[in-house]
């Protein structure tokens, strides 16, 4: 087993598609349209036996503490476990082809277009008896991006919002609107926390979507004028933002280097765990803002041409075991959507609204969407101006 670690917090799920990636993706779509369709007949000759190896490509801090070792022990399959730090890195490997990986993890607005580009193998449900434990409602959501749930196996979910240190915030603004995106986007409020540190995610899609939600506009809007309004909002608070960061902010919250941070919900949970491990008892909290936020469902998929497809199915079925996925949730505080696993999740985690949002929070969550390459380039240029404060 080889499981490298950066030692950082759970890395982001950026959604930005660069211009070069867009061109490659368009080329891949065309090429795949001319190649063998999914599910087409293949040679009747029996394939050679697979070597007992599995290559996994995943985010940092996105697996249970003992999951890989337990899988190796249960199956005798050796796991090579590599890490990536952005969806762009993963997508680049998939588009080039012959990645050598058997399992990858990404979110719905990425795998939707990647499925259409023919970058994944269809799942053989006969090899996934634990599929029966999955929440039908979540499968229905994912079917919007993966019709028929043919390619993507639900893994974990998280939300966007902001984390903050209660004591540091109260000391500066006793009546701070901690239920609202005013904490991030209202200049006179954000300025109050500039001295103790405010950070935004280094993810244009997440930041711009939250800005649009704050303006009571469609978070997935493709209107140029809506993007311009979000840009002006963000430029107004730019002087008070210490850093744009999607990984180190977890540690900085735990060590009081930041007092307010745009965050993914489960990263906040990791920050709490790390602060306790360091002997720090921080008064941290997380808010899914009343104006709305996104929820992201990550999945496990098998890249086209994976060298060990049977081992990949064994791994997915292992992850879908209620005991296994519950242990993952208990370790890293990401919610899972396995119905049979819920009674096995630590009650403190199961009752945490930042991990399992109750109906009143779910009502204000939205799914991210896909953008065409032209609009994505416009967002990229806008993001560059925002970060530079121009």
What are these regions (language model features)?
Residues 1-53:
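Short, low-complexity disordered leader/linker segments with a strong preference
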Residues 105-240, 245-254, 271:
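Extracytoplasmic ligand-binding site segments that recognize negatively charged/polar headgroups
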Residues 110-113, 260-281:
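A ligand-binding cleft/hinge motif common to bilobed small-molecule-binding domains
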